[in-house]
Design a protein with these regions (language model features):
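Single conserved hydrophobic/aromatic residue that forms the stacking wall/gate
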Residues: 1-4, 8-11
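Contiguous, well-folded functional domains in the mature portion of proteins
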Residues: 14-188
Length: 188
């Protein structure tokens, strides 16, 4: 995974099982099957890393929706964390459901209770079903206006189908600064 202006690349390992036969007959090798060792997600927004348990909303803090981490944004732009598909942009544009090419389902939730803004201060650059490359601008939001309305901008990034995996590991220490595109979460 590259950091800075380069975007993360998901690691993929290929395996090939070969049938060993002690007889003189040759057995054909089984077909190669790609296996995903891990899925690396880039930070979808620039800011300060926070543990999911520190999000002041029990649904996220108690990992009811899944596992991940959060970012307190320093910039009002959200980017695709990997190559994949925009499954759903919520009508209020504060939440994005994203599915990576390998099937990890990611919720990027901009702020807490920002659904109540009904899309005010948010601008979507994609639509449901769009296939995008990592780093594609998904949503812009007016940080100052949202803060003035009294909303917390902490942005949980949650793997909602974490039960399909072992765990999600944040690659940055809590309170570390990240740029959009930096290595952020690894799903194993």
């Amino acid at each position: 995974c590259l950091v800075g202006s380069e975007m993360c690349i998901r690691d993929r390992a290929e395996t090939e099982d070969e049938v060993q036969n002690t007889d003189t007959e040759k057995q054909p090798a089984q077909q190669s099957v790609p296996l995903v060792d891990k899925i690396e997600l880039c930070a979808p927004v620039a800011g300060t890393v926070k543990a999911l348990s520190d999000v002041p909303d029990k649904t996220f803090a108690d990992k009811v929706l899944g596992d991940g981490a959060a970012i307190v944004p320093s910039e009002g732009k959200v980017y695709a964390p990997a190559d994949g598909t925009v499954a759903n942009i919520m009508d209020s544009k504060h939440g994005i459901m994203f599915v990576t090419e390998s099937g990890a389902e990611i919720l990027i939730h901009i702020g807490l209770d920002t659904v109540n803004l009904n899309g005010k201060y948010f601008k979507s650059h994609v639509s449901d079903g769009d296939k995008v490359k990592k780093g594609k601008l998904l949503v812009e939001f007016d940080m100052d206006a949202i803060k003035k309305e009294g909303y917390d901008l902490i942005t949980p990034v949650v793997v909602t189908n974490i039960s399909d995996y072992i765990k999600a590991v944040c690659m940055e220490k809590e309170d570390a600064a990240v740029n959009a595109g930096d290595k952020f979460l690894t799903i194993v």
